[in-house]
């Protein structure tokens, strides 16, 4: 398990897990989330989540960015 950390995320995709970790992700704001072994492209299909908590487990390689209508979002990961 990783230490609890907080991040501000914008429109650029950021990797949260690499497919080997189980994490708890709290999202504040509206986020696009996808599973990809490499950095997704601009038009990548994604699930939209708002103000929620996700349990992410292997083999999911989680990427996240703020939704198109949102400025920045805040996530807390542990």
Q: Model regions: which residues?
A:
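Surface-exposed ligand/attachment interfaces on beta-rich extracellular proteins
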Residues: 2-21
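Low-complexity intrinsically disordered segments
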Residues: 4-5, 74-78
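Surface-exposed loop/edge segments in extracytoplasmic proteins
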Residues: 2-3, 39-47
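Beta-sandwich interaction modules
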Residues: 14-15, 47-59
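Noncatalytic modules at the cell exterior or secretory-pathway interfaces
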Residues: 20-25, 56-72
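A generic structural signal for ordered secondary structure
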Residues: 10-14, 29, 63-65
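Short, surface-exposed beta-strand/strand-loop-strand elements in extracellular ectodomains
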Residues: 26-43, 77
